[in-house]
Amino acid sequence: MTKFIFVTGGVVSSIGKGIVAASLGRLLKSRGYSVSILKLDPYINVDPGTMSPYQHGEVFVTADGAETDLDLGHYERFTDTPMSRLNSVTTGSIYQAVINKERRGDYNGGTVQVIPHITAEIRDRIHRVAQDTHPDVVITEIGGTVGDIESLPFLEAIRQFRKDVGRRDLAYIHVTLVPWIPSAGEMKTKPTQHSVKELRSIGIQPDILVCRCDRPLQAGMKEKMSEFCNVSPEAVITSQDASSIYEVPLMLEREGLAEQVLDILQLEQRQPDLTQWQRWVHQLQNPSRRVEVVIVGKYVRLNDAYLSVSESLRHAAASADADLQLRWVDAEDLENGDPATYLDGVDGIVVPGGFGARGVDGKVAAIQFARDHQIPFLGLCLGMQAAVIDWARNVAGLDGANSAEFDPETPHPVIALLPEQQDVVDLGGTMRLGLCPCKIQSGSLAQRLYGEDIIYERHRHRYEFNNAYRSLFLESGYCVSGTSPDSHLVEIVERPDHPFFIACQFHPEFVSRPNHPHPLFQGLIKAALGSDLTLVDPAPLPAETV
């Protein structure tokens, strides 16, 4: 029978509930338990697909094409387990489902209310994860902060959930802040006490407290919080600030979090195998060299907008024993100044995805700089489209070449709308989304990096390379090294006369893992370090299914 864990947060937002949930998933998996992690987000958007990156950060795409919260990326990277649309629930999607049922007459004319109908739908979504994926443990992170009005239906639903499964099959974990007050010279537990009091007023008694702090808890504090918050002293867990999020599972293991959870859920205590994770963290913390990579993006004011990109670079750099130095450059700055001012001296350039015309000419300028100065370059999604625009304007001499997305009147639409997108009106959930196969050309750089003839990657786009320009593209020295299996859609392009120049229409950052760095990011880092790419060992990717 599946067990259930609920992770709530108190005192402040962005306290790290997602990392705690992902870390616990890793600790349970290291003991041989299968895990699925679910995120309940209290915003009314149906999904984050149409939200501004400045407000929400990255939209993480699952293998089955769901546009989800960036925390699902943490869940996948920490547990090596693919998530799906079942693992992402928002207030908007809950209300949409309930209203659709009401319109169909499913409630037989009854008055539809938050309790019981909304809370029942929330509980059903949690049960569905257990029923469809059959994990040993389902971990559910509740977004927001205890006390927020938006989170109340979710908190009420998880209170009711105890009645569904029984007390022995459920655990509540509350992540809270224990701040250091410089003027007093001590840490304060009062915010935690009040947060737990608020949670208990809703009817939820936490079993475990995970205390975020910037230093070790002072003597007697665990006992004090134990007494005031009605948890055992062993269940008061310290989660001290770490230099890397990948240290957190090891820290929580030392604190005994997994053992406490297994005791509460009456599951067998097993010996963890964290050897691989410890080796990865050791690599991360003990580099022998340095590599500097610049990310030229549209949303760099919020680095979380490119979270999976930066983490993928970190995975690849650590696997090469290198300390990654990231330089963030706003693409718009390159439109107004000399690219050399921003890009001189870097070892590699990444141009990631985005939407809309703003900053695109800056991305094109960065790619031209990489091409002219033989700097290793990797383009992702819009980054590939910008590479094609650079080719058209600056190599093929097609004046005014552009994407039809940015200039519908361009004389040379080298990037065009996918045929199936022609009549699409709605924005949310209507792009080419999720895992798609890609055929790799033999003898290409892509084939050397992947070591496969067919690969599967995740997509999120409406526009593609315009095949009317493919012959001219090939004649000018470029290579189409990856296509859809029917050869119609261009998925990867590269420039053979460059040390490392490759761009893809998909999002490889969504499948990179600490123990499985993505081949394209590994190749970029190796090239940036001056390594011989003929010696690249193809990196296996985790198997995925839809």
Swiss-Prot record:
Protein name: CTP synthase
Enzyme Commission number, as recorded: 6.3.4.2
Presence of the UniProt keyword Plastid in the record: no
Glutamine amidotransferase type-1 domain location: 292-534
Further comment: CTPSs have evolved a hybrid strategy for distinguishing between UTP and CTP. The overlapping regions of the product feedback inhibitory and substrate sites recognize a common feature in both compounds, the triphosphate moiety. To differentiate isosteric substrate and product pyrimidine rings, an additional pocket far from the expected kinase/ligase catalytic site, specifically recognizes the cytosine and ribose portions of the product inhibitor.
Manganese keyword on record: no
InterPro entries cross-referenced by the UniProt entry: Class_I_gatase-like (IPR029062), CTP_synthase (IPR004468), CTP_synthase_N (IPR017456), GATASE (IPR017926), GATase1_CTP_Synthase (IPR033828), P-loop_NTPase (IPR027417)
Binding site for CTP: 13, 148-150, 188-193, 224
Organism: Synechococcus elongatus (strain ATCC 33912 / PCC 7942 / FACHB-805)
Catalyzed reactions: UTP + L-glutamine + ATP + H2O = CTP + L-glutamate + ADP + phosphate + 2 H(+); L-glutamine + H2O = L-glutamate + NH4(+); UTP + NH4(+) + ATP = CTP + ADP + phosphate + 2 H(+)
Family named by the database record: Belongs to the CTP synthase family.
Chain residues that bind ATP: 14-19, 71
Residues the entry annotates as binding Mg(2+): 71, 141
Gene Ontology CC annotations of this record: cytosol
Assigned keywords, A-Z: ATP-binding, Glutamine amidotransferase, Ligase, Magnesium, Metal-binding, Nucleotide-binding, Pyrimidine biosynthesis
Chain sites annotated for binding UTP: 13, 188-193, 224
Superkingdom assignment: Bacteria
Coiled coil segments of this chain: none
Biological process (GO), any one: pyrimidine nucleobase biosynthetic process
Gene Ontology molecular function, alphabetical: ATP binding; CTP synthase activity; glutaminase activity; identical protein binding; metal ion binding
